[in-house]
């Protein structure tokens, strides 16, 4: 059975799990240090969801909820389900818990992005009820002053 909780701070167990899980999501971003993870868990806008089963931590999700002039905005970020736990409903449980939590904080929509290459994840999001938005997503990178670019 999978249990989903919200971490209120970093622990050695959670930090070790992130060292294993983050590389499964991104090869360009290193796993967080213990202090970085603790800051994420404790940040007032964040809820850091942790899925565990009898084997240990099998997935995580970050929900960010913040007020803007047009309402309460909610974003799901960094959904990671351990390769060994995929296809067992962990991603669905994490997302459903986050959506319920966001609505409880006053959000009326929840957004997320997912690379097209993550086909299984995109199918899951659509089955849950997420819809593709008619919008563009842009990213601005901090210039590297050492190279002038």
Q: Could you describe each region identified by the protein language model?
A:
Residues 1-12, 143-149:
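Conserved N-terminal entry element of GNAT/NAT acetyltransferase domains
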Residues 9-39:
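Conserved GNAT-fold acetyl-CoA-binding loop/helix
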Residues 39-50, 70, 75:
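A short helix-loop-beta-strand connector motif used in the catalytic cores of GNAT acetyltransferases and
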Residues 50, 56-65, 75, 80:
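Conserved beta-strand in the GNAT
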Residues 66-76, 86, 133:
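A conserved beta-turn-beta hairpin within the catalytic core of GNAT-like acetyltransferases
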Residues 81, 87-100, 123-127:
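Conserved acetyl-CoA-binding loop-helix of GNAT-fold acetyltransferases
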Residues 92, 116-134, 139-142:
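Conserved active-site alpha-helix within GNAT-family acetyltransferase domains
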Residues 102-114:
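Conserved GNAT acetyl-CoA-binding A-motif
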């Amino acid at each position: 059975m999978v249990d989903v909780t919200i971490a209120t701070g970093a622990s050695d167990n959670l930090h070790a799990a992130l060292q294993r899980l983050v590389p499964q999501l991104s090869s360009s971003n290193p796993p967080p240090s213990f202090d970085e993870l603790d800051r994420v868990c404790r940040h007032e806008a964040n809820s850091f969801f942790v899925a565990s089963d009898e084997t240990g931590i099998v997935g995580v999700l970050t929900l960010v909820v913040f007020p803007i002039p047009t309402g309460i905005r909610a974003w799901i970020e960094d959904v990671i389900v351990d390769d060994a736990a995929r296809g067992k409903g962990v991603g669905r449980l994490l997302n459903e818990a986050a959506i319920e939590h966001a609505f409880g904080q006053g959000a009326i929509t929840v957004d997320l992005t997912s690379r097209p290459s993550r086909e299984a994840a995109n199918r899951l999001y659509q089955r849950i009820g997420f819809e593709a938005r008619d919008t563009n997503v842009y990213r601005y990178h901090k210039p590297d002053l050492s190279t002038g670019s």
